[in-house]
Amino acid sequence: MSGFFITATDTEVGKTVVAGALAGVFRELGYNIGVYKALQSGHVASNPEGDAARLKVLSGVPIKEDEICPYSIEEPLAPRLAMKRAGRAVTLKDIIHHYNERLKEFNSLFVEGAGGLAVPYTEDALVIDFAKELQLPLIVVARPTLGTVNHTVLTIAYAKAHGLTVAGVILSGCKECEMERVQENKVMIEELSGVPVLGLLPFFEGEFTKEEVLESAKEYIMISKLEEFIRNESTVAHTSSN
């Protein structure tokens, strides 16, 4: 298996934009990349304001929103609680099944979690349990300013304690007027965590187009570094199958 698991230090940090943009860029480069978000709360999958719809638009994948996100609920709560209140039982086995179904169509998947790694996800698992099952390298999306060093370093430490590989950090929502502090935070995160910050994605104000987001990803994220992970994972998978 190859791809990335996109997590974050919190909710509303920019995971969906990062996941969709990276998938879109890699698809432009010729990779057969898909996107997957197992559980979504706050919007049903078909809602154009929801994460599944945004992932579809940004990535350009030729599948339906409910194939990107098989389990969605309107109420904006942690997925486990939202599903429980709706009387729906979703297990870790269920979401892994749908993940494997998507792998029949794509060589690699960029998987978006929900909130951070310790979020209650299915009725029997946290987000980190799902990440451990997939064993994909993590991309941690974080805020660029005050508080981000602590949140990001703790997230990385938690992931490493559970045996996960962290490919890098992307600081999302960077404003030009804050860049001096953002750069200082970048350096501090790298020093304290030992993980590279692979991008400083700008703040998108108001409505934005797919083209704007993908061009920003190409300009501000180290795509070549992430491409090395994809190639290495593919090589390992090919070697293991022989």
Curated annotation (Swiss-Prot):
The record, for SUPFAM superfamilies, names: P-loop containing nucleoside triphosphate hydrolases
Look up the record and name the cofactor or cofactors this protein needs: Mg(2+)
Q: Which GO terms describe its biological process?
A: biotin biosynthetic process
Keywords linked to the UniProt accession: ATP-binding, Biotin biosynthesis, Cytoplasm, Ligase, Magnesium, Metal-binding, Nucleotide-binding
Could you give one GO CC term from the UniProt record? cytosol
Q: What does this protein do?
A: Catalyzes a mechanistically unusual reaction, the ATP-dependent insertion of CO2 between the N7 and N8 nitrogen atoms of 7,8-diaminopelargonic acid (DAPA, also called 7,8-diammoniononanoate) to form a ureido ring.
Binding residues annotated for ATP, in chain numbering:
12-17, 51, 112-115
- Is Cytoplasm there in the keyword field? yes
| Entry EC number(s) | 6.3.3.3
Protein family membership:
Belongs to the dethiobiotin synthetase family.
So what does this thing catalyse? Answer: (7R,8S)-7,8-diammoniononanoate + CO2 + ATP = (4R,5S)-dethiobiotin + ADP + phosphate + 3 H(+)
Membrane spanning segments where?
none
Enumerate the GO terms in the molecular function aspect.
ATP binding; dethiobiotin synthase activity; magnesium ion binding
- The identity of this protein, by name, is ATP-dependent dethiobiotin synthetase BioD
Broad class of enzyme this protein falls into:
ligase
The positions flagged as active site in the entry are 37
**Origin species:** Bacillus anthracis
The annotated subunit structure for this chain is:
Homodimer.
